[in-house]
């Protein structure tokens, strides 16, 4: 999206400078209530900070991202402080996760690191309840999750 803004001559800013008027982003999944799973790229913390800091947020998706239930196509990414990995996995199991996997890097050995130097766990849950985002954040060692439930966003449908 940044490159498109540059091509169109739209000014960009950072949170260091001021509060952005708008944020444009994508999503991995969008349910009928505009709840999202984001974070396949591993930037959940930054994405949530931008949404909370911006005057208005637009999520641009195509129809392949629409799901009747979150978690239908993708697991929930969870950013985890590396030294808390075992503890976080145990706590997430208690929340009913059916599968938890450490995201591994492609093209090199070892895990994916977020831009903050943390690991990403991909978790599968059959039932994503409205307070799951808060329950995940309450686990010591969880930095952020890819669940975006109840955010003030506008979803725009891209067409060809």
Where in the sequence are the language-model features?
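Conserved phosphate- and dinucleotide-binding cores of soluble alpha/beta proteins
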Residues: 6-160
């Amino acid at each position: 999206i940044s490159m498109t803004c540059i091509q169109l001559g739209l000014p960009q800013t950072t949170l260091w400078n001021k509060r952005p008027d708008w944020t444009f982003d994508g999503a991995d999944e969008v349910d009928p209530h505009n709840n999202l799973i984001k974070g396949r790229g591993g930037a959940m913390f930054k994405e949530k900070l931008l949404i909370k800091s911006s005057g208005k947020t637009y999520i641009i998706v195509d129809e392949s991202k629409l799901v009747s239930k979150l978690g239908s196509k993708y697991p929930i990414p969870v950013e985890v402080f590396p030294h808390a990995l075992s503890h976080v996995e145990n706590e997430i199991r208690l929340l009913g996760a059916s599968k938890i996997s450490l995201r591994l890097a492609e093209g090199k050995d070892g895990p994916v690191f977020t831009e903050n130097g943390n690991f990403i766990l991909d978790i599968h849950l059959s039932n994503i309840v409205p307070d799951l985002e808060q329950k995940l954040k309450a686990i010591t060692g969880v930095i952020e999750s890819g669940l975006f439930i109840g955010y003030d966003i506008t979803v725009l449908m891209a067409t060809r």
